[in-house]
């Protein structure tokens, strides 16, 4: 049995099938990432979680976490949040391009529905102000009764988490300029407060009057004098920082990976919530048994007996983009599909990537065949393609892309057998098919919503989040077995997690994908997105 844990702690325990053992390779995550944070009237920190379409509240003394707005609730992809004096919660929904409100009684409504890449939001003396994380973005005062907004300023190079300072002006990161600006609430021309930063993504005022700003690229938390722009380092936590909140003079910062850290004093920190995985998505194992874990805007390497090591992120040199699935193609070399519709070869250690094919709609699974062809599935069109001979050690070009199949029902996972036969999981049809001479033959049916698939030792393994199970089928005889059930994959009782749209020009649709991969030693690795961990399954 694998007891429920982390953000999935109220679920049922998972059960391995007869002859199988099941355990976690990484701890279960307690949050679905951590984006905007704000202190509530009750002294708890409220956390917006884009990946989980969730808002949670964290007790800073006990670490206890309570879900305030759940996945599947009325708030979708919240990036930042604010409260008014009546206790109404306002959230920017970055993938929906809107601002929504939840009342203390749990009722939802949209405040403003035309704000592409909605991100920062704050409330000050009866005024609700929100902005857009895009080049040329707007900062606007919103009418909470649904009237037309008032534009405070248009033309910001990516506004992020902001706050009104003691002088009554709005201070905000101009992220694209790598600067902090301020502007009067009635408009005018902005002034530069600080420059030459580490890509700031939040500006908050400590009760003592100085600015605390997280730097998403450098990973530093800076203390900045709003009068002179002079700065010093409060902490160096690592790339991916997001936001800041204060509780009774204590300083807390969030990280996109789901951690919340208290800065006790300059240079000294302690965790409130430990880091984890936001999703995770696709998995691949190389010949050395190293596992690459795709976690959207982050990817990690998992080596047996070691903790997760960051392989790359959206701000890393050569990172190919928001990654959905991965396949091993050589030492420190991986083929990936991205939310932007690209297939790319990525070499994390070298900090470089090469686009092999582009312009596709919602790419899902990818696999590399014995001859080096990269096979990938396009969800929206129901097609499967191959890049001939360019996946392993090819040059910089895109390669020759050929269509292998069309008319598939929401294809997701792909796998290639040792003889080159291509297998595809049709999530919409609840089956796995193989492609033979332009025809499709059903290999395994009666599934709920198959996603990731893998082949090892003549056996097909299927991650089926619709059934919260992993199924195995003997490709020679067709016999099937349940490898594990009650797994923390997908939603409760097989429900699908909220599917998110894109984030402006930065990222295409952020759809979930349950990956499964087989290691040379026979171990199966599974992305457990419901709890944010990687699981391992082994035959006894």
Would you name each region that the model predicts?
Residues 50, 94, 133-134, 175, ...:
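Short loop/turn segments immediately following the C-termini of beta-strands
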Residues 53-55, 97-99, 136-139, 178-180, ...:
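Structural signal for beta-propeller blades
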Residues 27-42, 72-89, 98, 114-131, ...:
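Beta-rich, blade/repeat-based domains predominating
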């Amino acid at each position: 049995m694998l007891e429920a844990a982390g953000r999935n702690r109220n679920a049922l325990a998972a059960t391995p099938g007869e002859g199988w053992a099941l355990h976690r390779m990484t701890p279960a995550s307690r949050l679905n990432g951590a984006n905007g944070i704000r202190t509530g009237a009750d002294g708890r920190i409220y956390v917006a979680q884009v990946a989980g379409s969730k808002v949670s509240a964290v007790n800073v003394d006990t670490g206890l976490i309570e879900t305030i707005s759940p996945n599947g609730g009325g708030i979708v992809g919240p990036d930042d949040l604010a409260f008014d004096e009546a206790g109404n919660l306002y959230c920017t929904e970055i993938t929906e391009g809107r601002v929504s409100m939840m009342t203390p009684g749990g009722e939802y409504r949209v405040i403003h529905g035309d704000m592409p890449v909605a991100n920062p939001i704050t409330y000050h003396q009866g005024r609700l102000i929100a902005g857009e994380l895009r080049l040329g973005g707007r900062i606007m005062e919103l009418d909470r009764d649904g009237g037309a907004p008032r534009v405070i300023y248009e033309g910001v190079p990516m506004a992020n988490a902001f706050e009104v300072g003691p002088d009554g002006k709005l201070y905000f990161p101009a992220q694209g300029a790598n600067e902090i600006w301020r502007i009067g609430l009635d408009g005018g021309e902005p002034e530069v407060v600080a420059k030459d930063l580490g890509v700031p993504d939040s500006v908050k005022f400590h009760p003592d009057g100085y600015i605390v700003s997280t730097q998403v690229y450098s990973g530093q938390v800076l203390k900045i004098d709003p009068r002179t722009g002079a700065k010093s380092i409060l902490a160096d936590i690592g790339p991916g920082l997001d936001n800041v909140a204060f509780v009774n003079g204590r300083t807390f910062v969030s990280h996109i990976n789901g951690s919340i850290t208290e800065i006790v004093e300059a240079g000294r920190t302690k965790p409130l919530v430990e880091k984890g995985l936001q999703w995770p998505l696709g998995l691949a194992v190389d010949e050395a048994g190293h596992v690459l874990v795709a976690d959207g805007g982050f990817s990690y390497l998992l080596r047996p007996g070691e903790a997760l090591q960051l392989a790359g992120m959206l701000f890393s040199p050569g990172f190919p983009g928001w990654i959905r699935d991965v396949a091993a193609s050589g030492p420190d070399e991986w083929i990936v599909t991205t939310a932007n519709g690209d297939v790319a070869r990525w070499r994390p250690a070298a900090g470089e990537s090469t686009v092999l094919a582009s312009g596709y709609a919602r790419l899902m699974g990818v696999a590399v065949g014995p001859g080096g062809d990269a096979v990938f599935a396009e969800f929206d069109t129901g097609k499967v393609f191959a890049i001939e001979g360019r996946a392993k050690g090819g040059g910089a070009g895109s390669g020759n892309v050929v269509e292998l199949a069309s008319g598939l029902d929401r294809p997701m996972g792909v796998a290639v057998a040792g003889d080159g036969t291509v297998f595809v999981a049709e999530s919409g049809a609840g089956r796995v098919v193989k492609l033979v001479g332009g025809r499709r033959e059903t290999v395994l049916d009666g599934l709920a919503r198959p996603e990731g698939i893998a082949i090892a030792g003549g056996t097909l393994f299927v991650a089926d989040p619709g059934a919260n199970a992993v199924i195995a089928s003997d490709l020679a005889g067709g016999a099937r077995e349940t490898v594990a059930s009650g797994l923390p994959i997908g939603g409760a009782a097989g429900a699908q997690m909220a599917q998110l749209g894109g984030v402006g020009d930065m990222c295409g649709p952020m759809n979930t994908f349950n990956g499964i991969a087989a290691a040379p030693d026979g171990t199966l690795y599974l992305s457990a997105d419901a709890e944010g961990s990687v699981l391992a399954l082994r035959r006894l």
